[in-house]
């Protein structure tokens, strides 16, 4: 018998389209606090080019700073691919992927940082291929919900490429050093169950249930404390994000301190041109 609470979690979602002005992505927001960014290049298995990444970053920033949004979903158009990485047809000879003006970019690295530093949970909703740079994007998301037809793997050494940043180091954190080396050195592909078994994804569902299950997970998170989730994400990232991770964690502590009477006493004293009185605040051991 289904729990009555599940009825609310599985209720139909109402998406509002915010895709105007975008060519490579679709962007939607739900009426209950979920943003969804969809890579919309199914003709190339949702491979990204510089324009795609620019649009993802713009939509992502909008979702981050929208106080009505609590969770962000990243996905690909259709059932054949989440994202197959960088579009090799626009990969140039001078260190990146060429935009329409001929400038070479590796701006997907900026988008990776956006995912890691965003205080809101980011959920990868994966159907079909999550390969190469697309595989790294799903790994960097906080959670991954996979369809049964999902395929995971790296292709870098086959196409003269690699991700020596989070694509290597964070993968090793997820699956262990030996398995990470296997994935990168052999360039094999793994089905959804294999990905689940090695800790690359959180759950596997039939493709027909993929969005419904993803929305359920998002709604469960939306029921919880946003400050707690924000600080937990920063804490979970800090051990492998170096100084940037510590900065994010410390920034959250500063934000919380600003909300306290003690923090506000310092501000008020400065603005009122008087000495602050911190004597009333506890000095806990």
Curated annotation (Swiss-Prot):
Keyword tags: Lyase, Menaquinone biosynthesis
Gene3D superfamilies named among the record's database cross-references: 2-enoyl-CoA Hydratase, Chain A, domain 1, Lyase 2-enoyl-coa Hydratase, Chain A, domain 2
Binding residues annotated for hydrogencarbonate, in chain numbering: 154-156
Enzyme class: lyase
Cofactor field: hydrogencarbonate
Residues binding substrate, per UniProt: 45, 84-88, 97, 129-133, 155, 161, 258, 273
Cellular component, GO annotation: cytosol
Gene Ontology biological process terms, A to Z: menaquinone biosynthetic process
Pathway: Quinol/quinone metabolism; 1,4-dihydroxy-2-naphthoate biosynthesis; 1,4-dihydroxy-2-naphthoate from chorismate: step 6/7; Quinol/quinone metabolism; menaquinone biosynthesis
PROSITE patterns: ENOYL_COA_HYDRATASE
Entry superkingdom: Bacteria
Site (Important for catalysis) location in chain: 97, 258
GO function terms (MF aspect): 1,4-dihydroxy-2-naphthoyl-CoA synthase activity
Reactions catalysed, as given in the entry: 2-succinylbenzoyl-CoA + H(+) = 1,4-dihydroxy-2-naphthoyl-CoA + H2O
E.C. numbers: 4.1.3.36
Family listed: Belongs to the enoyl-CoA hydratase/isomerase family. MenB subfamily.
Protein's job: Converts o-succinylbenzoyl-CoA (OSB-CoA) to 1,4-dihydroxy-2-naphthoyl-CoA (DHNA-CoA).
Name this polypeptide is given: 1,4-dihydroxy-2-naphthoyl-CoA synthase
Organism per entry: Haemophilus influenzae (strain ATCC 51907 / DSM 11121 / KW20 / Rd)
Encoding gene (name): menB
């Amino acid at each position: 018998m289904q729990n009555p609470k599940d009825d609310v979690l599985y209720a139909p979602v109402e998406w509002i389209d915010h895709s105007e002005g975008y060519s490579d992505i679709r962007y939607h927001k739900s009426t209950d606090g979920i943003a969804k960014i969809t890579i919309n290049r199914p003709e190339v298995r949702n491979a990204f080019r510089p324009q795609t990444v620019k649009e993802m970053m713009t939509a992502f920033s909008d979702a981050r700073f929208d106080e009505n949004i609590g969770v962000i979903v990243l996905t690909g158009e259709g059932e054949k691919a989440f994202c197959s990485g960088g579009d090799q047809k626009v990969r140039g000879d001078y260190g990146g992927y060429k935009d329409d003006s001929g400038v070479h970019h590796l701006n997907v690295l900026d988008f990776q940082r956006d995912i890691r530093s965003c205080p809101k949970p980011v959920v990868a909703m994966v159907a079909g291929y999550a390969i190469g740079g697309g595989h790294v994007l799903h790994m960097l998301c906080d959670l991954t919900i996979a369809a049964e037809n999902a395929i995971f793997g790296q292709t870098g050494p086959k196409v003269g490429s690699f991700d020596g940043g989070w694509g290597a180091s964070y993968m090793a954190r997820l699956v262990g050093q030996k398995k990470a080396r296997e994935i990168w050195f052999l360039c094999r592909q793994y089905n959804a169950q294999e990905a689940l078994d090695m800790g690359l994804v959180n759950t596997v569902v039939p493709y027909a249930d993929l969005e419904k299950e993803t929305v359920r997970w998002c709604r469960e998170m939306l029921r919880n404390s946003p400050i707690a989730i924000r600080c937990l994400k920063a804490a979970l990232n800090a051990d492998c994000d170096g100084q940037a991770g510590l900065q994010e964690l410390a920034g959250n502590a500063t934000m919380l301190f600003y909300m306290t009477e003690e923090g506000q006493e310092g501000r008020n004293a400065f603005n009122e041109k008087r000495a602050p009185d911190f004597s009333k605040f506890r000095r806990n051991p």
